[in-house]
């Protein structure tokens, strides 16, 4: 089922597969996504007046703020970009211009739409690729004009077509004309002139377009290259751009991370001028403006903005009032407990335990995690967070990597073995490191 037709409850259930807890944040993003579908059902001109309710997530690092937004975008198959607010500065200062957020989002949408269109025409492209490879192997008869005549396959072509589909001639070398790849050119421009750089790249890429060269390659590689070339021919670039821009305008999601770092704090000066400048530059994007991209004009009125920050040193009220008003939905995310760590390790769809079990399984090493082993691992990770910097669930990555360090290194020597990870094994590998505050600070 498409996420666009899912109820908020169904969206939360999908998010539950990957993120533990944080129900308030999940409910907020689920309602925001459902409201997009509701808006599409409203008749014009009222539809145009309904704007998304942007969300401000407040919570420490590693509790799932980014993951919620990323999974939501994946669920909705929507253009999504995550950017650090600290990378941007007020126009005139050294740093990136905030308009590049929308340009980058549009680039992502173009890529996403192109992949979708290429998949749609792939079967026709594969048929055309087969014919071109067969033309190189068994040239068709030519008519009076000298052009190849297409008709029923003769017995030789039928034989080669059958062998090609069965993969029996994959390693056979053929000489074939293929389009030259576009040159990858990097254009250096001063900050704030990214649009000019994009136009120059497009101009240089256009110089090489439609140029072909003869190349001798294996049938397997030739088939892949020709399928891509034939699929690209069948995609209408103008329609693709129009669809991609519409997708950005109606379904785009921008995740603004570290927004608390550009909040002006009362007791500091100096840099606050630039911080407030970034907020004022962001304001038109969030409330709705038109950004010029190399694919056309993009309106931001209905793009959903999700901002997040820990707000340790600043408060949401330190943001300029106009920007505060553009994020009407505020949700606080909870710090993760040891029980949450147990659930993250054992209950999520793509848990770290499943990932490491699959990785070592490729070398015929079978990992078996016991319940007490998982609990001990979670307790150690939670303990290190309490005594050093609290980096939330990201601590599980460092702890798991340290736990399986020796095993990963010697995996080939342990091929065919079953390794049981219980509490004793976890203590043996990690207790000394986790117990020492200095070691935990630098190793875990």
Swiss-Prot record:
Disordered: annotated segments: 130-158
GO biological process, one term: proteolysis involved in protein catabolic process
Any one Gene Ontology molecular-function term assigned to this protein's record: proteasome-activating activity
Broad class of the protein's primary localization: cytoplasm
Subcellular location: Cytoplasm
Superkingdom classification of source: Bacteria
CDD domains per record: RecA-like_HslU
Gene Ontology CC: one annotated term: HslUV protease complex
Record's keyword terms, sorted: ATP-binding, Chaperone, Cytoplasm, Nucleotide-binding
Annotated residues for binding of ATP: 20, 62-67, 257, 322, 394
HAMAP family: HslU
Subunit and interaction comment: A double ring-shaped homohexamer of HslV is capped on each side by a ring-shaped HslU homohexamer. The assembly of the HslU/HslV complex is dependent on binding of ATP.
Described function: ATPase subunit of a proteasome-like degradation complex; this subunit has chaperone activity. The binding of ATP and its subsequent hydrolysis by HslU are essential for unfolding of protein substrates subsequently hydrolyzed by HslV. HslU recognizes the N-terminal part of its protein substrates and unfolds these before they are guided to HslV for hydrolysis.
Family membership noted in the UniProt record: Belongs to the ClpX chaperone family. HslU subfamily.
NCBIfam families (alphabetical): hslU (TIGR00390), PRK05201.1 (NF003544)
Protein name per UniProt: ATP-dependent protease ATPase subunit HslU
């Amino acid at each position: 089922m498409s996420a666009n037709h899912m109820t908020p409850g169904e969206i939360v259930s999908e998010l539950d597969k990957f993120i533990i807890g944080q129900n308030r944040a999940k409910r907020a993003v689920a309602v925001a996504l459902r409201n997009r579908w509701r808006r599409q059902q409203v008749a014009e001109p009222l539809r145009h007046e309904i704007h998304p309710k942007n969300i401000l997530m407040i919570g420490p690092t590693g509790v799932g703020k980014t993951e919620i937004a990323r999974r939501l975008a994946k669920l909705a198959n929507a253009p999504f970009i995550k950017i650090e607010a600290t990378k941007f500065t007020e126009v005139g200062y050294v740093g990136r211009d905030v308009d590049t957020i929308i340009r980058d989002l549009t680039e992502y949408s173009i890529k996403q739409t192109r992949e979708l269109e290429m998949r749609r025409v792939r079967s026709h492209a594969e048929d055309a690729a087969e014919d071109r490879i067969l033309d190189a192997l068994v040239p068709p008869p030519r008519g009076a004009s000298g052009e190849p005549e297409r008709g029923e396959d003769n017995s030789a072509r039928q034989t080669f077509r059958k062998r090609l589909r069965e993969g029996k001639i994959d390693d056979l070398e053929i000489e074939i004309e293929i389009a030259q790849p576009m040159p990858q050119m990097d254009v250096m421009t001063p900050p704030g002139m990214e649009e000019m750089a994009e136009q120059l790249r497009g101009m240089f890429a256009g110089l090489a377009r439609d140029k072909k060269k003869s190349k001798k390659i294996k049938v397997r590689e030739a088939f892949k290259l020709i399928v891509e070339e034939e699929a690209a021919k069948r995609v209408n670039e103008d329609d693709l751009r129009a669809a991609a821009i519409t997708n950005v305008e109606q379904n785009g999601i921008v995740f603004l991370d570290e927004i608390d770092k550009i909040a002006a704090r009362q007791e500091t000066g100096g840099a606050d001028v630039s911080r407030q400048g970034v907020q004022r530059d962001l304001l038109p994007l969030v409330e709705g403006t038109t950004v010029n991209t190399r694919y056309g004009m993009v309106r931001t009125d209905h793009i959903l903005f999700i901002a997040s920050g820990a707000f340790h040193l600043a408060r949401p009220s330190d943001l300029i009032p106009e920007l505060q008003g553009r994020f009407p939905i505020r949700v606080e995310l909870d710090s993760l407990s040891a029980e949450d760590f147990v659930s993250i390790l054992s209950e999520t769809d793509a848990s770290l335990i499943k990932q490491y079990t699959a990785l070592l399984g490729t070398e015929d090493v079978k990992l078996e995690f016991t319940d007490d082993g998982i609990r001990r691992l979670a307790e150690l990770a939670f303990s290190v967070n309490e005594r050093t910097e609290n980096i939330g669930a990201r601590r599980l990555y460092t702890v798991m990597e340290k736990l399986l360090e020796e095993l990963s290194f010697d995996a080939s020597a342990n091929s065919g073995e079953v390794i049981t990870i219980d509490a004793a094994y976890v203590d043996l590998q990690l207790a000394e490191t986790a117990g020492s505050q200095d070691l935990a600070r630098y190793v875990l």
